Amino acid sequence: WEKAKEMLILPKVMEKMPDVNFYWVGDGPYRDKILPALEKFDNFHWLGHLKYPDEVRQFFSEIDIYALVSGIDMSPHTLLEAGLMKKPILATNVGGISESCKDGETCFLIKKNDSDDWINKISTLLNNKAKMKEMGESGYSYVKENFSWDKIADDFISILETNSKLASNKKN
C-alpha cells in the first residue's frame, strides 16, 4: 500500500490543473482504493494494463511528460523506458528512483506527499517546451550511457575484480 497510496495526492493536482490530462497505466491490488478518488475528474484516464512492448511504446510516444507517482520504489524500469523515448520525467523522490535519473537534468524529483511540488514541476515543463525537449534528450543520453548492457557488464566486471583483489589481500 505504501507504494500506491502516494497516488492519493493526485486529486489536488488534477483539481488545480483541469486542462492537463493524466493517464494512469497499470493495475494492482489497491486499484479499488485509488480509482474512486481519481475517476471523478474529467482529466483523469485509467488505461489499465498495457501489453509490452507494443502498447507501452505507443503510450510513451503519445505522452508529453512521464510521471511516476510512488510512495516507494527500488529501481523502476519505466523511468529508463521513458528516457529512451526522450520523455521528460517527473518522479517522487523515494527509494532508488534518484539513481535512475538526474534531478534538474533528466528529470524533476518531487518531494513525497507534496502536491504543490507536482503542480509547480508540471507547470514548469508545460510552459517551457524547450526545457521539455532538453530534458528528454538528456534523459535519452543518460540512459544510453549508464544503463546499456555494455556499461552494466563493465561495472559488474569491475566489482568482481575489486572483490577478487580484496579476497587476495586477505589471504596474504
Give the ranges of each region predicted by the language model.
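Short hydrophobic beta-strand element within catalytic cores of glycosyltransferases
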Residues: 88-91
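Nucleotide-activated donor-binding/catalytic signature segment of Leloir-type glycosyltransferases, i.e.
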Residues: 35-50
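Conserved acidic donor-binding segment of nucleotide-sugar-dependent glycosyltransferases
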Residues: 103-104, 108-115, 124-129
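C-terminal alpha-helical cap of glycosyltransferases
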Residues: 145, 149-172
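A short, well-ordered alpha-helix in the C-terminal region of glycosyltransferases
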Residues: 117, 124, 131-145, 155-158
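Aromatic "clamp/platform" in nucleotide-sugar-dependent glycosyltransferases that forms part
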Residues: 71-72
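A conserved mid-protein helix/loop that constitutes part of the nucleotide-sugar donor-binding site
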Residues: 1-16, 29-32, 116
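Short alpha-helical donor nucleotide-sugar binding micro-motif in glycosyltransferases
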Residues: 58-63, 118
